[in-house]
Curated annotation (Swiss-Prot):
Protein name, UniProt field: 4-hydroxy-tetrahydrodipicolinate synthase
Active site: Y140 (proton donor/acceptor), K168 (schiff-base intermediate with substrate)
PROSITE patterns: DHDPS_2
Organism: Streptococcus pneumoniae (strain 70585)
UniProt EC number: 4.3.3.7
Gene name of the record: dapA
One Pfam family cited in the UniProt record for this chain: DHDPS
Subcellular location per the Swiss-Prot or TrEMBL entry: Cytoplasm
Role this protein plays: Catalyzes the condensation of (S)-aspartate-beta-semialdehyde [(S)-ASA] and pyruvate to 4-hydroxy-tetrahydrodipicolinate (HTPA).
Length: 311
């Protein structure tokens, strides 16, 4: 699918990777999970991102995952492949492999983690990746995980590259507003923060790359529809009920909470791979009560004063 198909996507789900108890990928679980997403307003799917536990996946496993999901999706929604690493050469080799593999509207490349490059180093990293193949690139800017932040000024330099088509922005709403105001017209801006989706869409973002859409896609769609129809009272009411659910989804290192909920719902999401571990049983029960049932008492116990463990 093309850029134009991607431009129509408001809710892009950052898909989990289902695992067996022995840690191998559970390919048999994928069809039911995909159909669930598509039935609940997922417009596009990101594979091999943070929520997929990509640091624990080999490139060969990622390619197997890509093939399995493409077979199920069968062109119904655009797909994005996670292609970035903190090694520019490895990223180039993999983006070329994914481009040859085919079937993706874009590749998502994360800001290099651990190395702590300068702004010029980050600029050259993404420019070199974007120069390497015809696969359009979306930058993933998430300083809470990678320590360094790609500034809006550097992002706008990269936005002029013809093969860099957008950003998944996980910094501040102020940065997002600045980017939306100054970006090239066709440059796509997604928030990667479910809790900020309401504000981002009102600022003029193109959509959200989401974890919560695994479990709460219907209310996200309803909120976005209300925003599009200028029914801000309705949209804000949905957001007020949505925020505690998002907080619960990130009250333990992600994707452990969303996997606990999906397992509860009858899907074979399975465990996380080490070094991530499942949420403790009592915490998982509270998370499920918040996200699935909207239980106020569980909300207070689960999210009051919680600091996101990935930030």
């Amino acid at each position: 699918m093309s850029y134009q198909d991607l431009k129509e996507c408001k809710i892009i789900t950052a898909f989990i990777t289902p695992f067996h108890e022995d840690g191998s990928i559970n390919f048999d679980a994928i069809p039911a999970l995909i159909e669930h997403l598509l039935a609940h307003h997922t417009d596009g799917i990101l594979l091999a991102g943070t929520t997929a536990e990509s640091p624990t996946l080999t490139h060969d496993e990622e390619l197997e995952l890509f093939a399995a999901v493409q077979k199920v999706v069968n062109g119904r929604v655009p797909l994005i492949a996670g292609v970035g690493t903190n090694d520019t050469r490895d990223s180039i080799e993999f983006v070329k492999e994914v481009a040859e593999f085919g079937g993706f509207a874009a590749g998502l490349a994360i800001v290099p983690y651990y190395n702590k490059p300068s702004q010029e180093g980050m600029y050259q990293h993404f420019k070199t990746i974007a120069d390497a193949s015809d696969l359009p690139i979306i930058i993933y800017n998430i300083p809470g995980r990678v320590v360094v932040e790609l500034t809006p000024e550097t992002m706008l330099r990269l936005a002029d590259h013809p093969n860099i088509i957008g950003v998944k922005e996980c910094t501040s709403l102020a940065n997002m507003a600045y980017l939306i105001e100054h970006k090239p017209e066709e440059f796509l801006i997604y928030t990667g923060e479910d809790g900020d989706a309401f504000h981002a869409m009102n600022l003029g973002a193109d959509g959200v790359i989401s974890v919560a859409s695994h479990t709460n896609g219907d209310e996200m769609h309803e909120m976005f529809t209300a925003i599009a129809e200028s029914d801000m009272k309705k949209a804000a009411a949905i957001q007020r009920k949505f925020i505690p659910k998002v907080n619960a989804l990130f009250s333990y290192p992600s994707p452990a909470p969303v996997k606990a909920i999906l397992n509860y719902m009858g899907f074979e999401a399975g465990p996380t791979r080490l070094p991530l571990v499942p949420a403790p049983e009592e915490d998982a029960k509270r998370i499920i009560k918040v996200v699935v049932d909207g239980d106020y008492e569980a909300t207070k116990a689960t999210v009051t004063g919680v600091l996101r463990p990935d930030y």
